[in-house]
Each structure stands twice: as structure tokens, then as C-alpha cells.
Curated annotation (Swiss-Prot):
Name of the coding gene: GRHPR
Protein name, UniProt field: Glyoxylate reductase/hydroxypyruvate reductase
Lineage: Eukaryota, Metazoa, Chordata, Craniata, Vertebrata
PTM annotation (Phosphothreonine): residues: T298
Listed PANTHER family: 2-HYDROXYACID DEHYDROGENASE-RELATED, GLYOXYLATE REDUCTASE_HYDROXYPYRUVATE REDUCTASE
Site positions per UniProt: Raises pKa of active site His: E274
Annotated organism of origin: Homo sapiens (Human)
Gene3D superfamilies: NAD(P)-binding Rossmann-like Domain
Amino acid sequence: MRPVRLMKVFVTRRIPAEGRVALARAADCEVEQWDSDEPIPAKELERGVAGAHGLLCLLSDHVDKRILDAAGANLKVISTMSVGIDHLALDEIKKRGIRVGYTPDVLTDTTAELAVSLLLTTCRRLPEAIEEVKNGGWTSWKPLWLCGYGLTQSTVGIIGLGRIGQAIARRLKPFGVQRFLYTGRQPRPEEAAEFQAEFVSTPELAAQSDFIVVACSLTPATEGLCNKDFFQKMKETAVFINISRGDVVNQDDLYQALASGKIAAAGLDVTSPEPLPTNHPLLTLKNCVILPHIGSATHRTRNTMSLLAANNLLAGLRGEPMPSELKL
């Protein structure tokens, strides 16, 4: 009997256990993995993907024409362990007839929790307060010391009322938010009804909101959306939060707005680039809280993401419907 030819799968990083187990149990696949928690160097990715039928990658892996050329004609499926797909050269992938799987929905709640945590941390100045306790700055009670801004009776503006934007609004509503505004490509009256959210223009949202949360996808239309003009329209008491993509924000303009007191504070879970250099001007500001892109970082969510990414890959290799396929 002629031996069955195995399909080669290349995985660009150590992924959580549930995804690893699913791939290991696939008798029709030969799995090779970059055995590190650190990003795979481009040259190693080119080497590893050569001849592969399937590629399981992460958001930090830039799958461009060079990588696709290195993979060759065997490559049939790319599965990314992310909801974002801006790291994939989609036009080139579509041209080659390669199917793409991704992991939406499973990280919605976790990312929304992080957004609310970051908003509260930023508006109530928690990092500053912790530092004052540690360095001896806490000497006595003072009427205005470390005063921040509260959510009760506030106006919250959400840029992008998609799955994550809605989940954020749902969690903020019990804090006594008086008014929700949102902006996007088009009104979403059915989704907005739950929060009585009003569809407004981006300039209106900037001018009227006490808190702004960016939760949109990165597209040509949203790249650099939050710039000098945007920040100049904001209230001086407003707090700006970004949990979408770093490139939605002009970080030089954000720095100027924060340093000059044009806006009160900002909290970022995403930056450009990632990681942000330790000498970046934003890191010198007390009124800017920056996290290392941990929106989906819970054990349960990351395991679920890895399993979905593995199942997408295996289904694609076998010519079956993927649990979550990106329509190209």
C-alpha cells in the first residue's frame, strides 16, 4: 500500500494547549512549529512556510507577497489566531485562491472587559495613585489630590459600534452613563437601540463626548482618523481610549494634545509600532496609560482562539466549511 502523503502545516509560534492538541491529533497533517514565544524572524518564516499546505499565524506575522512566494503553490489555507486581518496581504492571497480563517466573536467579551478596565484606570488616575503610595507621596488627605473623572451622567462616544463596541457600551451602561454616541460607516439603529445610542459625525462625537473609545477596524478610511483636528475638537476634560489598532491614531498629535492639556488623559492598549520603543514621548506622560496589547489576554479566551484557529486550518485543508472563514 502506498503511504498517505501528509499535508504540511507550519505554525509561527507556540500556541495555547487546546489548539496544539487539535493539530497533534490530525493524522493527515505533519505539523512544524516555531518553538518560541517570541515572534518568528522573517527569514525563518520564509524557510518554515516553504512547501506548506497550511499556515497558522498570529497578528504580529506579516504575511506578504514575499512569504506567499516562499510558501509556493501548495499553500491552500492561512488561519490567523486573531480577529484583525491587517497583517495579511489579502489582495495577493485572494489572487492565489488561498482560503483564510480568523477568530472573531471569541474575544469580544474579553476585549470589552479590558476596554472598561483601561477606561477606569485612566480616568481615575490609578497608575499615578499607585506610584504616589510607593514613593511616599501619600502624606495626608487633600481635597483635589488625584481627582479624576467619573462615568455617572457622562457622555460616552464609541467609534465603531460593532461587536466589541456594543459589548463595551453594554458594560458601561450600568455605571450611569447618561448618553451614548457612536460613529461609523453607517447608522446601526437595531444595535444602537439597546443603549439609545445616537449616530453622529466624527467631529460631533469628538466635541460632545466626555469619554471616547476607539473600537473600529483599521481601514484606509480609519487610518489616522484621530489626529490633531480630532483632538482639538475634544473637551479639555475628556478621556481618550484606543483598543482597536494603533494606526487609527496619529500618536504625535495625541502626544501634543496630552502634553499641552488639550485633553485630560488617554489609555492605549494598541500602539504603532508594537512594541512601542521605551523612549517614545508618550511614555513620559503621567496622563497616558499604555498597555502591551492585552485585550484578549485571558487563559480561556486565548485557548478558545487557538482551538478555533486550528479547526479553521484543518477544515480548510480538508476542503470543508471553516467554523469562521473570512470572505475574500
